């Protein structure tokens, strides 16, 4: 028996149930942990402060995260290639190079790549997982155009375009002449681009048993939109504010995690309820839009398909089948078989509490040493004098031993040792040491070698490098593949962009499928100075090899080394300094000695033939001259004979 199609009300009920049961929903454990991490990041009070005592708050979480971020940004954003597609065969080389250049161009030029990476990494280091959303955004452009003195044919050609809308039209005609037209039009054009945006952790929901986004049963992005924005997004829908309500009947709009982001400077409302009901303009009232991506048997064929359902309150704005969930996640400490991992804040939050407690006790101890307590014999001292603390003050007593200071043990040496130990624990957990921060003045001495410093730095940074590799393999790589797929499926028009200092026409729809290429993220070791030193050594070795005639290096290898060195120096336009030998047209090589000899012999034979031909021509001319002479002689002889017969006497002519 065939199943019936799911009704819209059943779908809304399913979505509500998925939302309330999802991770990150309204104050669950994940949300509370992220809220606490934000409090620790800002260095806000713990809530256990005592009036009159020290209320110092350490910032270990903030310091650790802010020291890790420069290393991550240097790894991913310092080069000219965020991703590289490697061809599987010689026929894929040109396509892979163009895909590499264009995908990097889309990420860094069409989108704010640096800002996306910075916010993405910050969310992951602070809130367990960083989320970005990537999709193909189609948009419509309108351009105003004016034309004057058009004839009838020109007017018909112009307005016959379906994308043209006539705004103004004036017809002019003089007696005895055809009419002409002045016209103002709006020309519509449609295009699309890849869009990438960071998703706040508080706006992202995922089914509890999920291991990753693409295999999740349910994923939701809840975002605050004004009524005006909703009407622009869904122009065909009748959006009645009374029907929409507040866009949230179950208080899910309230999020302590989201509000904690603004707790440091109090820059947001403390209570976010059912939209901004105090806003007078109807178009500016806000509603919660839920973009739900769920697997459901919508058509009743017994097989679930992935659908995107957009809802505001109980109203469905769109319901369409899709092929992929448009989110990419990364986490610094991945836990196998789980979606959410651990953040750096999770690793060091307890250390911040311990250091804050130690520092509070130390400061209270110092206060007690400076303003200690006293044992006073009753009736033997003036208590008003004793309670008045001022320099040079006098305390009146009746006996020498009337006032005795109570001893306060000093905590300084023990506390500082404990703080050093806590810092070493942080180093082992997060990979951030005083040496890597540049704060240890005893790290470099006259006896410290560069190898020793590099060994210590490398050991301390291995944890950070592991985080970087985790980001590369679980997030950045997936993002670049998503960009490739979206370009391949949606961009069917040629676009001319500047790649490698040349204007190149790009048509991603003619590329091969992504599985013809592998993706590698540019995760290197060492800083720019080390890379330059290594490249210089390789360049010197390659030069010596070429001088020695070793066949292991050619001119193209030398160019590649030089180009890498130029890029490591910070210059991206390699062509300004070096010329790629592959672009130089080949020189016309001269003939070989054998060919030269054969050519000389051929020329000699040609000369001999020319001489023989000249001799033949001379002989022919001589024969012709003799023939002509004989003919003249014969004519003269005939004339003489004729005269002799007439005159009956001998005659000589000539």
Regions found by a protein language model. Name each.
Residues 1-55, 124, 132, 137-188, ...:
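C-terminal anchoring/interaction modules
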Residues 176, 200, 204, 214:
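Small/polar low-complexity and glycine-rich loop motifs
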Residues 277-279, 283-285, 297-304:
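Acidic, glycine-anchored loop motifs typical of Ca2+
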Residues 185-190, 196, 204, 210, ...:
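Low-complexity, glycine- and small/polar-enriched segments
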Residues 306-311:
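Calcium-binding acidic motifs and repeat modules
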Residues 206-231:
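Basic- and hydrophobic-enriched, low-structure N-terminal and domain-boundary segments
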Residues 285-293:
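Broad, structure-driven detector of short, well-ordered beta-strand segments within folded domains
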Residues 1-137, 200, 204:
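N-terminal-proximal low-complexity accessory segments that begin disordered
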């Amino acid at each position: 028996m065939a199943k019936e199609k799911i009704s819209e009300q059943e779908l809304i009920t399913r979505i509500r149930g998925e939302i309330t049961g999802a991770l990150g929903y309204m104050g669950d454990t994940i949300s509370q942990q992220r809220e606490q991490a934000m409090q620790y990041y800002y260095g806000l009070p713990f809530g256990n402060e005592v009036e009159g005592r020290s209320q110092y708050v350490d910032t270990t979480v903030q310091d650790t995260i802010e020291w890790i971020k420069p290393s991550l940004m240097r790894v991913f954003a310092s080069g000219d290639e965020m991703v590289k597609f490697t061809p599987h065969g010689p026929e894929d080389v040109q396509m892979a190079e163009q895909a590499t250049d264009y995908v990097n161009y889309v990420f860094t030029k069409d989108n704010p790549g640096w800002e996306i990476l910075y916010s993405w990494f910050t969310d992951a280091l602070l809130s367990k997982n960083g989320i970005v959303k990537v999709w193909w955004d189609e948009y419509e452009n309108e351009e105003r155009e004016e034309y004057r003195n058009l004839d009838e044919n020109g007017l018909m050609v112009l307005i016959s375009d379906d994308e043209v809308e006539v705004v103004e039209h004036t017809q002019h005609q003089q007696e005895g002449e055809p009419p002409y037209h002045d016209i103002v039009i709006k020309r519509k054009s449609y295009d699309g681009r890849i869009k990438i945006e960071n998703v706040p952790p508080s706006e992202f929901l995922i089914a509890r048993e999920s291991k990753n986004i693409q295999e999740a049963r349910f994923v939701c992005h809840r975002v605050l939109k004004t009524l005006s924005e909703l009407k622009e997004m869904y122009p065909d829908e009748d959006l009645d504010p009374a029907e929409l309500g507040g866009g949230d009947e179950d208080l899910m709009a309230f999020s302590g995690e989201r509000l904690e982001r603004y707790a440091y400077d109090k820059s947001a409302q403390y209570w976010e309820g059912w939209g901004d009901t105090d806003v007078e303009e109807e178009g500016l009232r806000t509603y919660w839009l839920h973009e739900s991506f769920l697997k459901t048997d919508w058509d009743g064929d017994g097989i679930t398909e992935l659908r995107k359902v957009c809802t505001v309150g109980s109203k469905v704005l769109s319901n369409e089948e899709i092929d992929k969930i448009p989110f990419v996640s990364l986490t610094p400490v991945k836990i196998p078989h789980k979606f959410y991992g651990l953040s750096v804040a999770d690793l060091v939050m307890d250390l911040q509490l311990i250091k804050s407690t130690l520092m509070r006790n130390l400061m209270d101890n110092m206060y007690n040493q400076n303003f200690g307590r006293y044992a006073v014999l009753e009736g033997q001292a003036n208590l008003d004098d004793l309670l008045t603390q001022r320099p040079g003050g006098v305390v009146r007593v009746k006996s020498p031993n009337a006032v005795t200071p109570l001893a306060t043990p000093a905590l300084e040496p023990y506390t500082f040792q404990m703080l050093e130990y806590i810092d070493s624990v942080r180093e082992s957990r997060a990979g951030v040491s005083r040496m890597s921060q540049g704060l240890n003045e005893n790290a470099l001495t006259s006896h410290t070698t560069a190898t020793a410093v590099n060994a210590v730095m490398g050991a301390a940074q291995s944890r950070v490098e592991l985080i970087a590799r985790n980001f590369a393999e679980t997030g950045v790589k997936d993002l670049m593949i998503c960009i490739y797929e979206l370009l391949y499926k949606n961009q069917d028009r040629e676009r001319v962009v500047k790649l490698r200092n040349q204007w190149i026409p790009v048509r991603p729809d003619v590329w091969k499928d992504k599985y013809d290429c592998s993706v590698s993220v540019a995760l290197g070791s060492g800083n720019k100075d080390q890379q330059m030193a290594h490249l210089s050594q390789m360049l010197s070795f390659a030069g010596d090899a070429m001088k020695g005639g070793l066949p292991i290096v050619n001119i193209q290898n030398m160019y590649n080394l030089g180009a890498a060195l130029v890029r490591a120096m910070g210059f991206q336009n390699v062509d300004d300094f070096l010329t790629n030998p592959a672009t130089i047209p080949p020189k016309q090589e001269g003939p070989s000695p054998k060919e030269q000899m054969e050519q000389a012999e051929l020329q000699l034979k040609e000369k001999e033939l020319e001489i023989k031909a000249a001799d033949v021509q001379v002989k022919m001319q001589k024969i012709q001259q003799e023939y002509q002479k004989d003919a003249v002689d014969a004519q003269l002889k005939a004339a003489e004979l004729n005269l002799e017969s007439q005159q009956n006497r001998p005659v000589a002519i000539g």
